[in-house]
């Protein structure tokens, strides 16, 4: 089955985890597994690229072991039988510490990056295009598993249902005429060009757009300088996603995520631990609009804990999920979406992954 776009991520999946890789693996495909090694007594974890869910046919078994000084086993399993092990006598992971693990599929091998550095190459023993499932088990906690297909090209809209390990439950839009949010700045929206759109099924049955035609930019650095500033390729448009993961500092007071259009801040998201609030706003010509603070539940960020933020752009608003749970919508006050092409992150956090 042809795969025409980047698959939506699995957010905060419980371990052990098995999930479908839509369309199977392809040359140039990139999978990022972001999480942390547990500091418990467990001594191993594994990431498996396999056919189906039985575990009898594993094209690539990546198995860090905190034993005998630490090493990583790579192997292949065919019809329930393991092949010869390949061992890397070096341990790039630490117990109790976060990691960013990236697998790049190439015609001859898997290339594995750990925290931004090439760790190992594993030459294919079976055809990689048979792989349609990723599994993770052992002594780890996951923030997300994301997918990138750099060969994405614009095609006629395709639709599919993407499973979430934790459903992102975005509320349905109210029927009838939508009320304008405060301080709406009128502007002419730019025409929407041909886009690959996949739909994601939420637990409550609503559908919302995901997977842009423009491949996302991914920055798999072990740590980011703060403040962190980068471009958003193509700007915002309906179905565009931005994903950030990191850890809140133990003594954090505030941090912010800004989506900018020139000198304007189209979207300002500002978790404030001193006020137990997540403030949202827009700044136009150095003048702030009215704040939005309402949340459906308690503050979604916790000092000293990791987090994953998913910002999904729709025609009328941004939908924001934290750790797989929808927390709010923010109606556009600057409506020329393609001009919103810069991401700024600052404050009391450590970033571990950014995808624009």
Swiss-Prot record:
TM annotation in the entry: none
Q: Which SUPFAM superfamilies match?
A: Concanavalin A-like lectins/glucanases
Q: Which InterPro entries match?
A: ConA-like_dom_sf (IPR013320), Galectin-like (IPR044156), Galectin_CRD (IPR001079)
Q: Name one GO biological process term.
A: negative regulation of CD4-positive, alpha-beta T cell proliferation
Tell me which residues bind a beta-D-galactoside 2: 288-294
Function summary = Binds galactosides.
User: Any further remarks?
Assistant: The LGALS9-like proteins are encoded by a duplicated regions on chromosome 17; there are at least 3 genes coding for galectin-9-like proteins.
Q: What is this protein called?
A: Galectin-9B
